Amino acid sequence: LLAKAKGIKVITVASSANKVTRAKRLGANLVIDRSKSDVIAQVLKYTKNRGVDAVIDHVGAKTWPVSIEALKVGGRMLACGTTTGADTTINIRAFYSKEAQIIGAYLGSKSQLVSLHKFMKLKKIRPIIDSVFNLKDAKQAHKKMESSNQFGKIILKI
């Protein structure tokens, strides 16, 4: 939603038909169901064999190789999550031959969060919330996250 609001073409990779449908409804330009098609082939077809300018990878170890392969020469990958693990192996030649950059991101500064909030308010963007759990049910919330069945944020109420 944020990228679309900035006028960026968005390619999303999803793991189920339900997530594909929901991502399309949110306005993604291209949604690839990784269980049914080759992500890289679809990205290259859509970008006319160029690759993408940037990837935001919030999944982690399992998706890094594909994320890097999808980049164009000079592309950048923003790494901001480790749901599938923190340790990964990448093809270093594929990385440096693309002159790619990997940028780590965590939460951002207070001023960045304030700017983000203002932008979301201006564009009327609301966060996508999958489910809300009481703190006592944190174990269930974590299991849901590990199952990859959520679409959006999982909230713990304190």
Residue ranges and their predicted role:
Residues 1-37, 42:
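Mid-domain Rossmann-like dinucleotide-binding core that forms the NAD(H)/NADP(H) cofactor-binding site
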Residues 6, 59-128, 157-158:
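Glycine-rich phosphate-binding loop and adjacent beta-alpha segment
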Residues 29-32, 127-133:
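Structural signal for short hydrophobic segments within the conserved structured cores
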Residues 55:
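Hydrophobic beta-strand segment of the Class I
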